[in-house]
Amino acid sequence: MDLWKKGKRFFRFSKEPVITCINTSYAGKEIIFDLIANPQMETKDVNLTLDFDAPIFHRKAGIDGLLTLTNKSKVNEIQLISIEVFIIGICKHKFHSSTVFLCLGTHIMEGQYIVPEELLDYAKKRGKNRIISIPNHSTVDIPFQVNFPKHVEVGPGRQIHSRVKVQYFAYANIIYQSADKLRSRRECQEINVLPSISPSSFLDSPSIMCVSKQPDLKKDRQRKSATRITVSLPRTDWLAGESVVSKIKIENHSKSSIKTLKLCLYRRIIGFDPPSWKTQQMMSHLNLSRKNSEVSKTCKCLQKETIRCNKKSNCYNWNGIAALETYTTECHIQIPDKEATITVGSNFEVDHFLKISVGNKLWTLNRVEIPFKIISANSLSLEQENVFLNLEKLTNKASPHGLPISVRLGNSLSYDALSAARRMRNTRYFLYS
């Protein structure tokens, strides 16, 4: 347990990962600790490789892979005892202990009781038992599949930031006997696992509205700060790479005009004071509130758009708001392609919010923040694209000023989500970018 200092306070920093997987036994935790501490274990006589048919895996489809085992020994045969495959999801923070939120394992082979078809040709009878013996200079390809239970949280997908990392690893572990000695060979490879979200549930996410602080008209009218902002989003879930459509209503109760409107998209990382180990495990399982233990907040502006009435490239044709007038507009701001909201950390979380402020060149009159959730565009299942296409037929009008089209059907929806999902699917994905 290490200590790190912020101001005059000291906080505990544990290097040991916190395991929040559901129904993880003591033996399972020891296996996870061993996998993280020793991701690769090499031997001279056995070569092991992991191959996957796709760089991205979804929760519904599971993980399909190929395990290639080669006996490099020139003399000895190897007797296989067990073959296991593990999938581990780790969320790391720069100043907090890492969190293991996903841990799945499957036995490909277990003695003579679980034997895949590809190894039946290598079975030999020894006494009353059967053994799997691989001769020297032989190579065996063993396919495997790992399925995700319904209750398992797979996280937001691979995310790499300066302070936070979400990574997924596939481990293959083999125990074998060679020359009357038990040996272990392990291989590790990074993969990407994404949740599967249907278009219907994505589009049916509830709308959200935030209102700025109610101004005191008697006191603030003379101070030129009697303004009120009302911001509404048609839904709370948005895809990475999509344009967020926000409806903004500005009530100017002051005697001065408003000439500037700013939209800023922020990523906020909230750190919590890590409690004791037992309390930490209880909080992770029960999803208890951690607002009382907040110790740090860091915000970074990802996108910024400033609308000025005297700017030539004003695509909204906004001329400002005169004194004692009310104005309503619809603005758009683009989400970066690789952003996602992260809530699987035990001592931290990453959220996003949109900040709208109004004012003049010299000062800001009022501001409001509205939170929302960002989902990876690859998580959206495109098997039901007719959900988008049928709703897109409802409008044939071009959006003014070259902006994305917004359709109102029950909730106001932006169907730039389909194009964002298609673009991410057609773009070559690099795991180690």
Swiss-Prot record:
SMART domains to which the protein is assigned, alphabetical: Arrestin_C (SM01017)
Which family is this sequence assigned to? Answer: Belongs to the arrestin family.
Supply the source organism for this entry: Schizosaccharomyces pombe (strain 972 / ATCC 24843)
**Which PANTHER family does its entry note?**
ARRESTIN DOMAIN CONTAINING PROTEIN (PTHR11188), ARRESTIN DOMAIN-CONTAINING PROTEIN C31A2.12 (PTHR11188:SF170)
UniProt GO molecular function: calcium ion binding; protein-macromolecule adaptor activity; ubiquitin protein ligase binding
Biological process, per Gene Ontology = ubiquitin-dependent endocytosis
Superkingdom, taxonomy of origin: Eukaryota
Query: Which terms in the GO cellular component ontology are assigned?
Result: cytoplasm; cytosol; plasma membrane
Task: Return the protein name.
Answer: Uncharacterized protein C557.05
